[in-house]
UniProtKB/Swiss-Prot annotation:
Pfam families for this protein: ATP-synt (PF00231)
Function in brief: Produces ATP from ADP in the presence of a proton gradient across the membrane. The gamma chain is believed to be important in regulating ATPase activity and the flow of protons through the CF(0) complex.
Subunit text: F-type ATPases have 2 components, CF(1) - the catalytic core - and CF(0) - the membrane proton channel. CF(1) has five subunits: alpha(3), beta(3), gamma(1), delta(1), epsilon(1). CF(0) has three main subunits: a, b and c.
Name by which UniProt lists this protein: ATP synthase gamma chain
GO cellular component: plasma membrane; proton-transporting ATP synthase complex
Subcellular location(s) per record: Cell inner membrane
Keywords from the UniProt entry: ATP synthesis, Cell inner membrane, Cell membrane, CF(1), Hydrogen ion transport, Ion transport, Membrane, Transport
Broad class of where this protein is predominantly found: membrane
Lineage per the UniProt record: Bacteria, Pseudomonadati, Pseudomonadota, Gammaproteobacteria, Moraxellales
Cysteine pairs bridged by disulfides in the record: none
Annotated GO biological process: proton motive force-driven plasma membrane ATP synthesis
Gene, per the UniProt record: atpG
InterPro entries (UniProt xref): ATP_synth_F1_ATPase_gsu, ATP_synth_F1_gsu, ATP_synth_F1_gsu_CS
Gene Ontology MF: a single term: ATP binding
Family listed: Belongs to the ATPase gamma chain family.
Amino acid sequence: MANLKEIRAKVASIKSTQKITRAMQMVAASKMRRAQERMAQGRPYADNMRRVIAHLVQANPEYKHRYMVDRPVKRVGYIIVSSDRGLAGGLNINLFKKVVQHVKAQQEQSIEVQFALIGQKAVSFFKNYGGKVLGATTQIGDAPSLEQLTGSVQVMLDAFDKGELDRIYLVSNGFVNAMTQKPKVEQLVPLAPAEEGDDLNRTYGWDYIYEPEAEELLNGLLVRYIESMVYQGVIENVACEQSARMVAMKAATDNAGQLIKDLQLIYNKLRQAAITQEISEIVGGAAAV
């Protein structure tokens, strides 16, 4: 059994670690709130762009853009959004399980898969998992910009334009609340079929005059919209990362507190036993005299 000095040293070490985990919990909570604000700020941009695209499509029904037309699926691309750092519980592990499950379903249908990776954790995972990686982006930070992500998006769109991919998916973590994050798979290209009530399925009674031509404008808008969807996915993933880290650090802080209590109990018992032993020896010595 450890002696009193060893237990005191262990308690001091755990208390030091507890201070670190408590500080990390507070930092993660602050970063999570900022990421949530960026999520809220980015949604109106994507929503308004989707409405303009919907109007352009309805105003020019004869023009079928390649990003809105389904074709036989033989090759599929995945844009995987992960974090650069760990200490976020099972956030990335659950995401990769979702990817592997989805990829396996594609491969069972003899569909080839390719990847574009965002985040160091995804790069490390697919280095072991294998697969054809078209591009990778790491070190995006807690406040990523759209410019950091365009490379990974463009390499997938180029492959789609060349006929090397027939469908592109975005895989990222969805923010439910501060305690819950769920991995999700969204179809990016071709744009997923419109659901009832969706902007792409809505009839508008107003008209615009477009400069330049609507077809040229649609070409640029669709690329920009796809980039904004990936950006929104990355921002949401940052919020998920920080919330998962906040929860993980809170659990670590609580566990450290419980461990300190257990060690202090052991310390007190050992100290009590040592004092009792000393008293017994003194009493025994006095009796002998």
